Amino acid sequence: MKFALTGGGTGGHLSIAKALAIELEKQGIEAIYLGSTYGQDKEWFENSPLFSERYFFNTQGVVNKSFFKKIGSLFLQAKAAFKAKEILKKHQITHTISVGGFSAGPASFASLLNKIPLYIHEQNAIKGSLNRYLSPKAKAVFSSYAFKDKGNHVLTSYPVQNAFFDFARTRTEIKHILFLGGSQGAKAINEFALLNAPKLTKQGIKITHICGPNSYEQVRFFYQELGLLDKIELFAFHNNITEIMHRADLCVSRAGASSVWELCANGLPTIFIPYPFASNNHQYYNVLEFEKENLCYVVPQNELLPKKLFEVIRKLNQKDDQGNKNLTTISNQLQQKIAKDGAKTIIETILSA
C-alpha cells in the first residue's frame, strides 16, 4: 500500500496535505508528493521527511487569466499529467488524495487514467473549479461543510494538526490581539492594525502582527513612525503559529478555510475579513455558518473602519444572563465545534473502503 498526496499552491491547501501526511506516517504508510514549482509547494515540502519522494511540475492555474494564458496553462497541465502517470505507475501507488488547488490537476487526472482510487478533500464551503469537475469521478469527497449534491461526499472534522488543540484555552479577558495577515500578507488587515495600534497600546492591550514577508518593511516603517515599534510584536511570518495563537485573546484574520478551523480548534474568538476577490466569494461562505451561530464577527473589507474593532471588543466584554462574558462563551463553543483527529478519520475511512 502506497499513497500519493497532491495539491497545494497556498498554505491552506498545503496545511491539509501536511496533516494527512503526518497521519499516514503515524500509521506506517509510505507516501509521495506531487505538486507545482509555482506557489508555495516547494517551500513546504521540497525537503520534507514526510514523503519518500517529491515531484514538482511546471504548472500554473487558469483562474482569472486571459484566454491565451488559459490555453498555455492547460497545455502545461496536460504535459505534467502524462509525467505524473508514469510516476504513479513507477511507485505502484494504490491511493491518491487531492487537497485541491491547481497543482492537484496532473496527479489527479493521472490517477483516473491509471485507475487508481482518487479521494478529494474540499477545504472551502464553495468548491474550486478543479474539485467541481473531479468530484463525480472520485471515490469520496471529504469536507467540513455540507454540500447540496451529497452523492459521494463525506462530512468530517477539518484535518487540523493536533498542536492547535493542544495549545487551545478558554479566553476570559482581551489583553492581547493577533492581527493575522496570512502567508501572502493582507493589505487591508495590515492597515487596520496600524490604524488601531495607537489606541490599543494606550489601553494596555498587547499586539502581535503577522504582516506577510512582502509587506514587512513597509509595515515596520509605519510602526516606527508611530513610535510603537518597540511596543508591539511584528513578524513577516512565524513558524510556531500555534504558540502565537495561544497567547492571543482576539484575532483579526482573513477567512481561508484552514485559518478558520485552526482558530476554531484553538478557541480563539475572531473578527473575519473575507477576501472580497476570492473565487465565488468562498471566504465569506467559509464563515457564514460560524456567523449564524454567533461564533465569530464578519466585517466586509469595504466596512473595515477602526471603530469596528472597538465595537466588537465591547460586545465581547458584555455578559449574558448567567454572568458569562460573550468572549468566554464563544471561546468555549468554538472548541466544541471541531473534533480532534480529523486527518485520522479521513485516512481510516479511506483504508476501510
From Swiss-Prot:
Gene Ontology molecular function: UDP-N-acetyl-D-glucosamine:N-acetylmuramoyl-L-alanyl-D-glutamyl-meso-2,6-diaminopimelyl-D-alanyl-D-alanine-diphosphoundecaprenol 4-beta-N-acetylglucosaminlytransferase activity; undecaprenyldiphospho-muramoylpentapeptide beta-N-acetylglucosaminyltransferase activity
Stored SUPFAM superfamilies: UDP-Glycosyltransferase/glycogen phosphorylase
Coiled coil: none
Keyword terms, alphabetized: Cell cycle, Cell division, Cell inner membrane, Cell membrane, Cell shape, Cell wall biogenesis/degradation, Glycosyltransferase, Membrane, Peptidoglycan synthesis, Transferase
InterPro entries: GlcNAc_MurG, Glyco_trans_28_C, GlycoTrans_28_N
Similarity section: Belongs to the glycosyltransferase 28 family. MurG subfamily.
Stated name of the protein: UDP-N-acetylglucosamine--N-acetylmuramyl-(pentapeptide) pyrophosphoryl-undecaprenol N-acetylglucosamine transferase
Organism: Helicobacter pylori (strain ATCC 700392 / 26695) (Campylobacter pylori)
